[in-house]
UniProtKB/Swiss-Prot annotation:
Residues with Phosphoserine modification: 164, 463
Annotated spans, Disordered: 164-209, 236-256, 341-360, 478-500
Zinc finger boundaries on the chain: C2H2-type: 372-394, 400-422, 428-451
Domain BTB: 32-96
Record's protein name: Zinc finger and BTB domain-containing protein 34
One MF term in the entry's GO annotations: RNA polymerase II cis-regulatory region sequence-specific DNA binding
Amino acid sequence: MDSSSFIQFDVPEYSSTVLSQLNELRLQGKLCDIIVHIQGQPFRAHKAVLAASSPYFRDHSALSTMSGLSISVIKNPNVFEQLLSFCYTGRMSLQLKDVVSFLTAASFLQMQCVIDKCTQILESIHSKISVGDVDSVTVGAEENPESRNGVKDSSFFANPVEISPPYCSQGRQPTASSDLRMETTPSKALRSRLQEEGHSDRGSSGSVSEYEIQIEGDHEQGDLLVRESQITEVKVKMEKSDRPSCSDSSSLGDDGYHTEMVDGEQVVAVNVGSYGSVLQHAYSYSQAASQPTNVSEAFGSLSNSSPSRSMLSCFRGGRARQKRALSVHLHSDLQGLVQGSDSEAMMNNPGYESSPRERSARGHWYPYNERLICIYCGKSFNQKGSLDRHMRLHMGITPFVCKFCGKKYTRKDQLEYHIRGHTDDKPFRCEICGKCFPFQGTLNQHLRKNHPGVAEVRSRIESPERTDVYVEQKLENDASASEMGLDSRMEIHTVSDAPD
């Protein structure tokens, strides 16, 4: 063998072993260079691991100089503890009732693999409900109170759900039917809540009964509406402090969710299945098509092409778009559809769209990226950089530091405006005395103090936005205006002095 040749070897488990050792160091509190505070509870971690696992930490401009960070968006410390463990191990165990909390936290931290897995869990909930169980409960609901609402506690309300991402070499391989490994221990609190709720038939005589399953969490409640053996919506009841605020934009269309009133409670309905909601279908139903006489036929004609969307915008902290008038029209449209009203009655309905252009425009209202939404105020953005700059205001991040005095700012333009006070950059000039000032406010004070009564000075103040072309053009206009005024005054003077 040649002594200059290279010998290569590969240890497949080395990377996972390094992460495992880092996790042991984290649990022991050794060599940790940052402390993340969640609701006052500290969590020690390594910046490199956080930055490699979460784009939120990676794009944090001041992370390299910080020794501590507080995140107020995540309300449950246990949720962040599981997500932090996931960064080191690639595994996470969560209860089904906490999926919404994990989805909200993962969306804020931009952990895409957790977001996709939580969304997949919500979409696959309908596979845990047997159609035969629903039919049997409708007949013997009074005989078997523990199986009311057509749900088996032991098969649906599971305690930990195991999540293993594809890149985790130690994770278990998912089965063909589902990616969830569920224990069969039922929750007593959930079972008692199911017994108290009972099943409710909200439809008319010709409609399909709806069975509600209450999922109780720490901060949210969800109603899963079962229609025609498919869960098509997740309805999240918001607390008073977390209620979505009114907005000028509508939540209908391709956002995948809307707001409505259920039993006097305002809820946010989210499409999680492969079928759109029946309310949205009633609004976009074509006039030329044959109108179904019941909800079952309406669901039969729904399209399968509606993709599920990100759930971030519909849960706590997200600002839901709503218009109550449209919700009333949609409700009346659905009632007319269930009662088998003819096309003339639907045309007389104020909520029915008679024009194909209106129906086409309805599906394209207010498009935006659901994942670029501020968790604090619900404002949506088109670019990630705009969201990052906006989040600095809520997080108190001040990456722009003045090199003269050390004062910190959240935006670069604020720092540039502040630096004018330290340098000779004085773009605001007084037209009366020629003195220059670094700020517009300082110039205004100078005018009020030293040049009172000058009404036209403010309109002639030069600002940094005005170019030399603008100034030259304005001087030419002023000169021509003065010549015209002089000519008119001379003409008047000549006429008045003329002999009779």
